[in-house]
Amino acid sequence: MQFIDRITIKVTAGTGGHGKSAFRREKFVAKGGPSGGDGGRGGDVIFRVDNNMNTLLDFRYHRKFTAKNGENGDIKNQYGHNAPPCIVKVPQGTLVKDADTGEILADLTELGQEAVIAKGGRGGRGNAKFANSANRAPTFAEFGEPGEVKNLLLELKLQIGRASCRERV
C-alpha cells in the first residue's frame, strides 16, 4: 500500500439561488403586489475526521470537491431550498492549509471533528423584499452570491505511538 502524506486539492462551495421577480395573479385582483421568493443558500464544504481513513491516498485521483447550489426562489413568496453541505472525510491528524496564502484553516486531530472550510453563497432576495412605501411594485430581484473557491494543501501529521520495552535482567 502506498502512503501519501501531502496533497493539493480544490474545493468549491455552492452558489446561492437567485431571487424571483414575480407578481400575484388572481382572477379578480387586477393589480396584485410583488410575490417573488428568496433563493436558497449554497452548500458549504465541511471536512470531517473519519476513523476508517489513515492516509490521503483517496485524494490522489479525486482532487475537486464541489457543493451543490441553492435553489432559486419561486412565485407566491416561495423560498428556494438550501443546498446540503459537501462532506469530505479526512484521516485523523490532517492539517488543512490554504495553498495560495499558507494560512492554516483547520487542524483536525479528534475523531468526528468537523471544520467548515468553504462557505456557501447567500441566496438572492426576491422582489417582495424590496417593496416599500415609495416603490410598491419593484420589478427587480437579486442574484445569489457565489460560494468560496479555495486551493488547499492537506498534510497528514505523523502520529507516534509509545511502546514500552522492559529490559531482561
Regions found by a protein language model. Name each.
Residues M1-R162:
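Conserved P-loop NTPase architecture
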Residues A163-V169:
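Conserved small/polar residues in nucleotide/adenosyl-binding loops
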